Amino acid sequence: MISSKPRLVVPYGLKTLLEGVSRAILKTNPTNITQFAAVYFKELIVFREGNSSLDIKDLIKQFHQMKVEKWAEGVTVEKKECIKEPIKPPPVPCKPTHMEKSTDTEEDNVAGPLFSNKTTQFPSVHAEVQSEETSEGARGPSDKPTTPKTDYTPPSSPPPAPVSAEYAYVPADPAQFAAQMLGNVPSTYSEVLMVDVATSTPAVPQDVLSAEFAEEVVLSAPLVCSGETVEVQVVSKTSAQVVVGPVSEAEPPKASSAPLQGEQEPPAHEAPDTQVTSASRISSIYNDVPVNEGVVYVEEIPGYIVIPFTDHDQVACVKEIEQSPPGSPKAVEPKTKISIESLKTVQVEENSQHKSSVHVEAEATVLLSNTALDGQPEVPAEPLDAEGFFKVASENSLHLETEIVIINPDDPGQEESGGNAAPHSSGDPFPPAPGGLTEPEMQPDGEAAPEQV
């Protein structure tokens, strides 16, 4: 039976032609196969015109030997050159022979070695080599006139001083830096700036003939006596101006070795007047009612006056002198004695014509607990501590102001004032004021003492 499908006949030489183009593509391995096939057939047509008598098989064979082999060799050579090209150094671009006038400036024409003169903080080998030239240029006007040079640096930048072999210290102050660069000040002088002024403080002597100062000291001390807790806080602001005349004309006056910054020495007065002013206040409470009484006095020594200043060198002592027993129905009237000692003494020239006066105002706060005194254990008094103290329930205060006037013992008025002083009984816990001082008058806000609960 005959099939209806048509039979396809492969023309002669098609298989050979397709095999030849496939081999050429495999050998050369082109990037664009379509373009390579078009070139292949064009070259094959040209080659066939010269060899028309050859069979298609022989024609493809000779064409491959003459053309395709060369194409394959050329491709391999090109690939090797592409691999070797990155290894070759890039060509050096030629330098421009001329510059445009718009960008050509005088700074571009300055020689390279001249820039090394601007380095002032660190030495360099070039600076050591040219140190002789710079030194000659620096001392040229004194020795002999120097001839002008074409490559001389402009006058705005002076030549630096000779650089040493080691590193030079550069001061922070611009004035000292300029002086060091000009050679007027040696480099070792700038080492003084390295001293830390924040940690170095001058020591003030204890004995000062003329001084003006203001200080504020807070002292607190816990006291427990016969079942009653007493907390004393002394806040004093003292200001004094002491002017003392010379002891003898032959002896030179002494001055403070460390004066305050920006303060001039006050002139010495001829009159040996001594005036001391101290301010202090005393306040105390017990069950929200002020009950304390205090005496502040200044101890006088012949030829010396003890100034009652309160600072780090002085001690303020508060002692409980007298107190009613816990079971007593009488009102509790504790009495406090404040004795202020000082390490600062001022020698005073004795002169009957001049009087020495002292004004004292004291401020203190005595805090007592509001709890009942019954059943409270008796604890010995603890020493004065300026940092820690016991807290109590009430913190109301009583302010007292006292004024004390001290008259020279040589003055007859002193005897009269001492005679008018009230005598003290043997049981009085307060001793009489030394040196014939009168007892200061106390002015409490409330005189009635509270009774025990």
From Swiss-Prot:
GO molecular function, one term: calcium ion binding
Record field: transmembrane: none
Annotated spans, Disordered: 86-165, 246-278, 406-453
Pfam families reported in the protein's UniProt record: RIIa
Protein's cellular compartments: Cytoplasm; Cytoplasm, Cytoskeleton; Cell projection, Cilium, Flagellum
Keyword Cell cycle: no
Domain of life: Eukaryota
Keywords in alphabetical order: Calcium, Cell projection, Cilium, Cytoplasm, Cytoskeleton, Flagellum, Metal-binding, Phosphoprotein
Tissue note: Expressed in spermatozoa.
Main location class: cytoplasm
PTM description: Phosphorylated on tyrosine residues during in vitro capacitation. Dephosphorylation affects its ability to bind calcium.
Residues of the RIIa domain: 12-49
Gene Ontology terms: biological process: calcium-mediated signaling; sperm capacitation
Biased composition (Low complexity): 143-154
InterPro entries per UniProt: CABYR (IPR038848), cAMP_dep_PK_reg_su_I/II_a/b (IPR003117), DD_CABYR_SP17 (IPR047579)
GO cellular component: cytoplasm; cytoskeleton; cytosol; motile cilium; nucleoplasm; sperm end piece; sperm fibrous sheath; sperm principal piece
Keyword Cytoplasm carried by entry: yes
Annotated function: May function as a regulator of both motility- and head-associated functions such as capacitation and the acrosome reaction. May bind calcium in vitro.
PANTHER family xrefs: CALCIUM-BINDING TYROSINE PHOSPHORYLATION-REGULATED PROTEIN
Descriptive protein name: Calcium-binding tyrosine phosphorylation-regulated protein
Species the sequence originates in: Mus musculus (Mouse)
Phylogenetic classification of the source organism: Eukaryota, Metazoa, Chordata, Craniata, Vertebrata
